[in-house]
Structures are given as structure tokens and as C-alpha cells.
């Protein structure tokens, strides 16, 4: 086989590494034996060491200074035989530290330690690290990069079948671009996962083998048909989403490990429920469900969690942080899963159809949860009272009734709620928003439930009856509070004055007497009130609304109490 002839020096007295490099074609490389390939590497190393010791530049003429450059070549721990015409025994002083070495190869190895100190220095904080892999991990702390390729191994990747010098090879660039600079080594090969045999014995760079690259640059494929299904694993924010449970992952390896928990019976079995896992760490996290062990407590409310990620998501309830933003509509979310659900609503595609009722769903785990409505399955059980639920979220909300946790606090008045939806509805009291409209009379409400209760006024429906006196009510909660009149029960007591009340809402309003708080402000005149009902009555002064009409004479009034007083005058006249 004929190897390509080395190029001649372009200038008198100037020798570059490419001038003495020997390049093989793809076909020629395949014909080399293992011993010949090892010899090829040794020769290239000797040439590099010789040129470095002479202070020559190892790059092309257009490239920049050699002090920050190095070549990445995989070497085995074997003896290197000096070539003819090369005298390794010579005094070689190191310009960096002053150390003098006689052997040219030892001198080359010594100089490489200085290069590594520069190459493995963090550009953000100047910290030196021992290894390039540690630099990769350290750099992620500065740039927050979650998606990164596999660390470049100590192997020889050569672009376009040439030994190339890499300049600053371990400086991270903007996400989505090459990890290595344009004049460096393995710009395209860095994204390809190579086996040990390919790295040791394969050609320096196999062109045409991985022409199709995933947009995230985490995986490369040999055919276009292979990359398309891989790309479907991503959402718009670049995460891997599990189609079985909706959980999202920033790294493909974490996503792949998680999927094994759904698809395969792992070697780690739970002794309590028999569930199996492919990883021991997953089993340990699962066992905390049975033991109740929670290793991560919230400093704000004291609630504990079995996983650190769950604690981080929970803390956003207190801080109000919503880091996940939809790029199309600008809507923000506190949890990544909520953003994913929202984004899937853009296309409107509902791939999962219920055979029982015909309802469709965008996500598989939502479809699975829905099917439990028909099957009656309730796999999530409360450890306090034994009540079971079909969805985990319903169990979490139910457990707040036992713990008394109210994580959602109104910044206007300080009132806390168990559910975010209740906080949203409450905040409409301060903003004046009333999105629910009665079709009969046009009256507006800030809660859908209040609209449903109000509509019973028009229909005359009163489905809830008092067991003692038979009085009918349109609201179940009103029946519960009313029955306390018969029993004399007043379970809500004020800590300040000891006064007790029938309902928690009445106690909450009463506490404002002691605090002096008046959260309900009139937008017309600025007057404030302690109760929402007082503000509603006051607004009628500005609007002129008189909703209470006398059936006898047709006279209208702003307040029901005034109407009752007026009706008594008709009764007196009748007597």
C-alpha cells in the first residue's frame, strides 16, 4: 500500500507537524494490522515530540500561537523506539518551570502537564481541574447547561483523516454548537458515541458513517429514519418526556434508565408491594413511600419530601417562581410537567381515546388516570384515614387536610389555601374579576361554584335538606353550617377574645377586628372594608343598583335589610 507522501515545507527552515504527518485513506487504514496501527501512532508521537522540543509550531500557518495548543492522541503504555536521525538524549530546559530533562519524550510529557493546567482552567472562575471530565462538570455549574455530549475520551479523533491540533478544546460554547473550536479536533465526531474497539483500532475518523445528527447533538445516527423517532422524544423545551407517566428528563441517559422501570422487570424488588426496579436508587426512593421516610424538609412550612427534586418544585409554591415559560404564548409554570401539558395543547392532537366513554387525551398517563374512573381502581391510599384515590395529586391534596398545610398564600390579605385553584378564585375578590356570567339575569361571579349555586335561584332547585327542621338549601356547605344551629356546635374559636363561630370563614372575618385589616378596597372612592359583602353593598352607592324589589308596591332597595323593614310597613297597614 502506498501512503500519501509528506508535504514539503512551505518555507526555508520552517517545519509544521502536517509537513511530516503521514495520512492514510479509509481503504488503506482497514488493511493495516494492529501492530502497524500501533507503529503509526508511535511514529506520530515521536514526530510531535521532536517538533515540540525544537519550538516549532504544530499547526498550519494561518493558525495562532502554539503555546495554547496540543494534540489529543490515544497512547498505550508501551516503549517508544527512537527513529533514525532523532537523538532523544539532549538537554531540554522547560521554559515554564526551568526543569531540565534529557529525554525528548519525557520532556514532551512534562510540557503536556503545563498545557493541561491551561486547558483545564475554568474560564468563568479561573479554577484549575485535574481532568477534562471534571472541567466539563465544573463548567456546567457556571452556564447551567443540562444537555451535553459525552466527555471526549483520551482518544485520537482526527478530522478529515488528518492529525489536527486542537486549540482550547475544553472551553464550552453556546448550547447547540460544537464543544470544540473550528480549528480543533473532532468537531463532528464528538457527538458520536464510539465503542472502545472503534477508538482503539478503528480509523481516526470514519466519514459518512453518521451523517444524521439529532438537533440536541446528544446522539448521532447513520440513517435519516433513525433520527426522526429519536427527535419525537423531545418537547419544545428540549426535554425527554416519558409517555407512560409524563415525567420529563434533561439527559437522555436518565430518561432511558427511567423507562426501564416501566418496560422491564428489574433485579431490585420491593419487599412491601413486590414492585421491581432496574436501579437500586429507584428502589430506595420507592421504599420511602412505605416507610414514610422523608429526607428533604421544606424550611418554610416544614413539609418533607423523599426526593430532592420534589422539594425544589415545592419551594416554588412559596417563592412564586415560574421558571418554565411557553415560547409561543409566554405563559409561565412552576413545574416542567405543567409546561409540557400546556405545550401539547398547541397542536390539539389527542392520540389516546377511551373505549368506554369516547373521551380523548393528549398524554398517555392522563388516559391511564381516566380509565380508573371506569374500573374503580384507587391505587393511592392515605396512611392517616385509609381513604383511597385514583390519582396521586388528589391524595396529596387530601393529605393537606390532615397536616393543616395551606401552602398557597394571598399576598394581598395573607389568607392561605390548600389548593392553588382556591387561591386563584380568592384573588379575584381583590382584582374585581368576575368571569362567570349568569345567562338568566346577567349577574357575574368570581367562582364557577357560586354561579352554579346562584342558578338554583332561577330553577328553584334546593337539593340539600336539614335533617332536623327540613329546611332546604341549594348549597351543601350551607346545610352543614345551618345544622350547627341545632346542635349548638361552634368549632371555630378566636384566640384573641375566645369568641366562637359556626364557620371558618366567619372566624377569619372576625379576626380582622383585632388586626384592623381591611383588604377590600373600593376602586371608585378608595374606601376599604373588612368583608367582601360590605364592599359589594358599598359599590351600589356608586352604581345606583337596587336589586331588592318589593312585590307589593314595586319599590326597590339597595339592601335586603331595608326591604324587610319596608315590607313590615305593609303588614302594619293591613292590620
UniProtKB/Swiss-Prot annotation:
GO terms for biological process: regulation of transcription by RNA polymerase II. Signal peptide: none annotated. GO terms for molecular function: DNA-binding transcription factor activity, RNA polymerase II-specific; RNA polymerase II cis-regulatory region sequence-specific DNA binding; zinc ion binding. It holds the Pfam family KRAB. Keywords: DNA-binding, Metal-binding, Nucleus, Repeat, Transcription, Transcription regulation, Zinc, Zinc-finger. InterPro entries: KRAB, KRAB_dom_sf, Znf_C2H2-type, Znf_C2H2_sf, Znf_C2H2_type. It is found in: Nucleus. The keyword Metal-binding applies. The keyword Disulfide bond does not apply. Residues 69-88 are annotated as: Disordered. A zinc finger (C2H2-type) spans 92-114, 240-262, 268-290, 296-318, 324-346, 352-374, 380-402, 408-430, 436-458, 464-486, 492-514, 520-542, 548-570. Belongs to the krueppel C2H2-type zinc-finger protein family. This is Zinc finger protein 417.
Amino acid at each position: 500500500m502506498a501512503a500519501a507522501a509528506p508535504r514539503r515545507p512551505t518555507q526555508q527552515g520552517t517545519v509544521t507537524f502536517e509537513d511530516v504527518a503521514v495520512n492514510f485513506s479509509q481503504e488503506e487504514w482497514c488493511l493495516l494490522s494492529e501492530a502497524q496501527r500501533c507503529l503509526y501512532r508511535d511514529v506520530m508521537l515521536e514526530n510531535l515530540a521532536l517538533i515540540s522540543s525544537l519550538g516549532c509550531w504544530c499547526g498550519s500557518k494561518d493558525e495562532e500561537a502554539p503555546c495554547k495548543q496540543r494534540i489529543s492522541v490515544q497512547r498505550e503504555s508501551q516503549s517508544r523506539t527512537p527513529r533514525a536521525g532523532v537523538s532523544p538524549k539532549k538537554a531540554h530546559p522547560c521554559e515554564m518551570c526551568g526543569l531540565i530533562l534529557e529525554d525528548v519524550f519525557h520532556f514532551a510529557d512534562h510540557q503536556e502537564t503545563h498545557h493541561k493546567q491551561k486547558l483545564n482552567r475554568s474560564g468563568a472562575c479561573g479554577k484549575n481541574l485535574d481532568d477534562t471530565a471534571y472541567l466539563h462538570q465544573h463548567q456546567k455549574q457556571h452556564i447551567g447547561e443540562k444537555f451535553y455530549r459525552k466527555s471526549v475520551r483520551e482518544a485520537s479523533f482526527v478530522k478529515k483523516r488528518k492529525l489536527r491540533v486542537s486549540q482550547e478544546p475544553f472551553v464550552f460554547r453556546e448550547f447547540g454548537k460544537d464543544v470544540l473550536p473550528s480549528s480543533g479536533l473532532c468537531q463532528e465526531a464528538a457527538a458520536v458515541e464510539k465503542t472502545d474497539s472503534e477508538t482503539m483500532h478503528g480509523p481516526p475518523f470514519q466519514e459518512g458513517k453518521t451523517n444524521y445528527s439529532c438537533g440536541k447533538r446528544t446522539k448521532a445516527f447513520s440513517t435519516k429514519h433513525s433520527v426522526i423517532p429519536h427527535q419525537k422524544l423531545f418537547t419544545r423545551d428540549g426535554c425527554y418526556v416519558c409517555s407512560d407517566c409524563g415525567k420529563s428528563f434533561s439527559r437522555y441517559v436518565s430518561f432511558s434508565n427511567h423507562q426501564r422501570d416501566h418496560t422491564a422487570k428489574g433485579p431490585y424488588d420491593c419487599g412491601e408491594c413486590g414492585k421491581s426496579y432496574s436501579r437500586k436508587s429507584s428502589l430506595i426512593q420507592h421504599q420511602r413511600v412505605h416507610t414514610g421516610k422523608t429526607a428533604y424538609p421544606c424550611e418554610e412550612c416544614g413539609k418533607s419530601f423523599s426526593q430532592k427534586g420534589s422539594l425544589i418544585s415545592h419551594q416554588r409554591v412559596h417563592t412564586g417562581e415560574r421558571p418554565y415559560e411557553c415560547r409561543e404564548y409566554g405563559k409561565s409554570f412552576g413545574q416542567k410537567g405543567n409546561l409540557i401539558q400546556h405545550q401539547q395543547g398547541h397542536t390539539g392532537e389527542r392520540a389516546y381515546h377511551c373505549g368506554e366513554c369516547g373521551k380523548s387525551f393528549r398524554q398517555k398517563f392522563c388516559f391511564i388516570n381516566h380509565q380508573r374512573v371506569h374500573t374503580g381502581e384507587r391505587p393511592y391510599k392515605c396512611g392517616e384515614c385509609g381513604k383511597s384515590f385514583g390519582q396521586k395529586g388528589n391524595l396529596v391534596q387530601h393529605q393537606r387536610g390532615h397536616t393543616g398545610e395551606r401552602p398557597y398564600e394571598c399576598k394581598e390579605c395573607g389568607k392561605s389555601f390548600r389548593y392553588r385553584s382556591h387561591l386563584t378564585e380568592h384573588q379575584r375578590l381583590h382584582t374585581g374579576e368576575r368571569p362567570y356570567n349568569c345567562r338568566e339575569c346577567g349577574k357575574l361571579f368570581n367562582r364557577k361554584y357560586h354561579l352554579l349555586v346562584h342558578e338554583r335561584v332561577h330553577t328553584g332547585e334546593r337539593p340539600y335538606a336539614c335533617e332536623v327542621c327540613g329546611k332546604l338549601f341549594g348549597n351543601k356547605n350551607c346545610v352543614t353550617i345551618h345544622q350547627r344551629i341545632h346542635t349548638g356546635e361552634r368549632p371555630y374559636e378566636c384566640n384573641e377574645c375566645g369568641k366562637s363561630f359556626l364557620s371558618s370563614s366567619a372566624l377569619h372575618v372576625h379576626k380582622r377586628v383585632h388586626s384592623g385589616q381591611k383588604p377590600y378596597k373600593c376602586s371608585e372612592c378608595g374606601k376599604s372594608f373588612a368583608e367582601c359583602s360590605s364592599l359589594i353593598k358599598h359599590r351600589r352607592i356608586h352604581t345606583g343598583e337596587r336589586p331588592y324589589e318589593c312585590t307589593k308596591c314595586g319599590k326597590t332597595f339597595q339592601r335586603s335589610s331595608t326591604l324587610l323593614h319596608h315590607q313590615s310597613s305593609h303588614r302594619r297597614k293591613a292590620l
